Amino acid sequence: MTIALTGGGTGGHLAIVRCLLESAIKKNIECVYIGSQNGQDKAWFENEARFKEKFFLSSKGVVNQNKFGKISSLLHTLKLSKDCREIFKKYHIQAVFSVGGYSAAPASFAALFSHLPLFIHEQNSKSGSLNMLLKPFATKFFSAFEKEFSPYPVANKFFDNARIRKELKNIIFLGGSQGAQFINELALNLAPKLQEQNIKIIHQCGKNDFEKCKKHYQSLNIQADVFDFSSNLGEKMKNADLAISRAGASTLFELCANTLPAIFIPYPYATKNHQYFNAKFLQDQALCQIFTQDSINLDDFFKAMLKLNLEDISTRLQNIAQKNGGDILLEKALSNNLAFIR
């Protein structure tokens, strides 16, 4: 059996694709990847040999364009969807699994035009424009935030390194692989207070601020674990007792899998303010704290960190993320829809 995996643009989307690929391989399902020349798709998968084939199309987004730009992008997407139908025929694709993002549009529309089963995974609490449009036509729509709960695919390494936290000895600041300037500045401003409490610092600061952050810690004589990017983030999280982080869905569920308590500072310019609502999913269960970027007072923030009941939160986080989520999604998608797949 061969399926197409499509979507991407951001690391969060692409991490789900990778989980689904690994799950498909375990089930002896071959995968063709259809992404975009833009975004991070090529950087992630251009050299991924486990795909049967990879296609990086000239797809582009429709959001934030003027009227004529939207029309032009839609026409271009329809043209690319025709190319995807040829890919489906050539590789005998039997189903399409989309993780969203504009790079998923051509293959998703092609699935509908070709009468192939279309499965969609929405990663955020607020659906993206493409997923909202296609949801009524999808064979199955998966979301970890909806009442009909579906697991969020997270790499097993985050589960394998999980532990119950009891005391704040180490803190990790997660600005993402691209860095988050606000979180970087917050970490540097908190550093003297953390040193006074003998709390060790782990700091993912991104490439742009790496030298600046490293020099700042050195000037304070603080032995911080500063890095721009790590392929072994699960191990870094394992060493931490609390995370200060943005609230992208992948990061949020990786923290849950690792049972690592967090204070979230949602990116204020995220589409539909989805990072805030991602974090609110946990806050409503008393499993995190949220500070908006424009309301942070350094002293209040530091006090909130020290007051968290880490053991209680860490213990209850075990019930949020589900191991082998990719396996479960594929099982739900394919086993219940065999009538569609010939």
Swiss-Prot record:
One family name in Pfam for this protein: Glyco_tran_28_C
Superkingdom of source: Bacteria
Name of protein: UDP-N-acetylglucosamine--N-acetylmuramyl-(pentapeptide) pyrophosphoryl-undecaprenol N-acetylglucosamine transferase
Biological pathway: Cell wall biogenesis; peptidoglycan biosynthesis
Name of the coding gene: murG
Catalyzed chemical reaction(s): di-trans,octa-cis-undecaprenyl diphospho-N-acetyl-alpha-D-muramoyl-L-alanyl-D-glutamyl-meso-2,6-diaminopimeloyl-D-alanyl-D-alanine + UDP-N-acetyl-alpha-D-glucosamine = di-trans,octa-cis-undecaprenyl diphospho-[N-acetyl-alpha-D-glucosaminyl-(1->4)]-N-acetyl-alpha-D-muramoyl-L-alanyl-D-glutamyl-meso-2,6-diaminopimeloyl-D-alanyl-D-alanine + UDP + H(+)
Protein function: Cell wall formation. Catalyzes the transfer of a GlcNAc subunit on undecaprenyl-pyrophosphoryl-MurNAc-pentapeptide (lipid intermediate I) to form undecaprenyl-pyrophosphoryl-MurNAc-(pentapeptide)GlcNAc (lipid intermediate II).
EC assignment: 2.4.1.227
Gene Ontology cellular component terms for the protein in this record: plasma membrane
Keyword Membrane attached: yes
EC top class, as a word: transferase
Protein localization: Cell inner membrane
UniProt GO MF annotations: UDP-N-acetyl-D-glucosamine:N-acetylmuramoyl-L-alanyl-D-glutamyl-meso-2,6-diaminopimelyl-D-alanyl-D-alanine-diphosphoundecaprenol 4-beta-N-acetylglucosaminlytransferase activity; undecaprenyldiphospho-muramoylpentapeptide beta-N-acetylglucosaminyltransferase activity
Protein residues bound to UDP-N-acetyl-alpha-D-glucosamine: T10, G11, G12, N124, S177, Q275
Similarity comment: family membership: Belongs to the glycosyltransferase 28 family. MurG subfamily.
Keywords assigned: Cell cycle, Cell division, Cell inner membrane, Cell membrane, Cell shape, Cell wall biogenesis/degradation, Glycosyltransferase, Membrane, Peptidoglycan synthesis, Transferase
Any one biological process term the GO annotation gives: cell division
SUPFAM superfamilies: UDP-Glycosyltransferase/glycogen phosphorylase
Organism: Campylobacter jejuni subsp. doylei (strain ATCC BAA-1458 / RM4099 / 269.97)
Lineage: Bacteria, Pseudomonadati, Campylobacterota, Epsilonproteobacteria, Campylobacterales
Mode of membrane association: Peripheral membrane protein
